[in-house]
Design a protein with these regions (language model features):
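Rossmann-fold NAD(P)-binding glycine/threonine-rich loop
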Residues: 23-35, 42-65, 71-83
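Short helix-capping segments at alpha-helix termini
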Residues: 35, 59-60, 86-88, 121-125
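Short glycine-/small-residue-rich Rossmann-like dinucleotide-binding loops
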Residues: 14, 20-21, 44, 150-152
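Residue-level detector of anion-binding/catalytic polar loops
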Residues: 15, 38, 62, 92, ...
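C-terminal substrate-binding/catalytic lobe of Rossmann-fold NAD(P)-dependent oxidoreductases
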Residues: 1-7, 89-211
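N-terminal glycine-/serine-/threonine-rich beta1-alpha1-beta2 phosphate-ribose binding loop
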Residues: 1-34
Length: 211
């Protein structure tokens, strides 16, 4: 079926897997809520208002939303939260990500997901701790903050590294994607998982039983 009528395309569908753009994903979320179709969202780059709109649609239908659908990244996310909760503020948290030259959002959705996990480990929200840009900043690093750095080049699928650094030691954990197949496989797993679930906003940690 080839059509520009989204509701028609959803007739008989059990789930939609959506890797698109924020505005398109919002239209899809609205249509899924109206047709009781589960919605798996791999799109990144949403602003706060768009995030809130998605949460509203999740009151009516199952939405699985994740900045990264891969098994490895979500296991890493779980580890980041645990490590963050175990370490005190003497350990500075930095997140470095690299993607292909054409990626438009920075930091990546995955980097923000890792940042959110680190913030949860401290009992805070990422908005309270995030430092996204240091260009021109002359002051020292604020204790407890979470820093981000983004690299773009070539055809890199995705690399993410989270470091916890004190005056005397450093813990670093890294994930590197070799193929985009990992995102497809995770999205299919999420769609199958969503079939028996009540309406709500979920993520891959729910799908993989990591929380």
């Amino acid at each position: 079926l080839i059509t520009d009528d989204l509701k028609l395309a959803l007739e008989g569908a059990e789930a939609v897997i959506d890797f698109s753009m924020p505005d398109t994903s919002l239209e899809c979320a609205k249509a899924c809520a109206q047709t009781d179709t589960a919605h798996v969202i791999g799109t990144t780059g949403f602003n706060l208002g768009q995030e809130n709109e998605i949460a509203e649609y999740a009151n009516k239908v199952v939405i699985v939303k994740a900045g990264n659908m891969s098994l490895g990244i979500n296991v890493l996310t779980s580890f980041v939260e645990k490590i963050s909760s175990s370490l005190d503020l003497d350990f500075d948290i930095e997140i470095l990500e690299m993607h292909h030259r054409d990626k438009v959002d920075a930091p990546s959705g995955t980097a923000l997901m890792l940042g959110e996990a680190a913030a949860r480990g401290k009992g805070k929200s990422l908005s309270e701790l995030r430092v996204a840009l240091r260009d021109g900043i002359s002051a020292g690093r604020e204790k407890g903050s979470i820093g981000f750095a983004s690299l773009r080049g070539g055809g890199v699928v995705g690399e993410h590294e989270v470091s916890f650094t004190s005056d005397s030691e450093r813990i670093s954990i890294k994930h590197e994607a070799f193929s985009r197949d990992i995102f497809v496989n995770g999205a299919i797993k999420a769609a199958l998982w969503s079939k028996e679930k009540d309406p709500g906003l979920y993520d891959m940690l729910n799908v993989l039983n990591l929380r």
